[in-house]
């Protein structure tokens, strides 16, 4: 293995470890020492490759967001029927919630700090989506409301349970396995709420 390959592999290991600590285990305050120990590398390598723990966190967050944005764009650009697009979007969002259970909690915490506001959707996509929603309402497939209310409903149904995961788990006295099962079951529930039969 070349030096460059070893360097690249070490960076990937550190990033994957950080992603696991931050977004799977919910340890947003994990230190460089904890990340290094978990990754099996020297702590100085984190500073060498990423300059700081906060920079590493931003990098892994941006990568997770980029992957999700790319998935959404593929769905939006497809020629699928509107309900099929929404179904794929819901499946992708729920899959991400299961893969990174604390990602939504992190996003909400960053929004509250004022440090996480990036335009997630281009104006052209937004206009097309609102137009498609209006068309579905006119066809009677969705209850009539302002199209943006449909988006609010969908996003709320998808994100809220994951964003308050620790609170739900504590108050409902359920473990990670049961919570993940409930999240996995949400696709049909959400579709039945959003669309008329």
Stretch-by-stretch model annotation:
Residues 95-131, 149, 175-181:
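Short secondary-structure transition hinges
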Residues 127-139, 143, 157-197:
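C-terminal peripheral helix-coil segments that are non-catalytic and often amphipathic
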Residues 90-93, 106-110, 154, 158, ...:
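Short alpha-helical scaffolding segments that buttress acidic/His motifs in well-ordered protein cores
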Residues 67, 96, 100, 114, ...:
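Phosphate/oxyanion-binding loops and surfaces in catalytic or ligand/nucleic-acid-binding neighborhoods
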Residues 73-102, 139-151:
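Hydrophobic alpha-helical connector segments
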Residues 1-9:
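N-terminal intrinsically disordered/low-complexity leader segments
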Residues 58-88, 126, 133-137:
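Amphipathic alpha-helical linker/stalk segments
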Residues 13, 17, 21-55, 59:
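Helix-turn-helix
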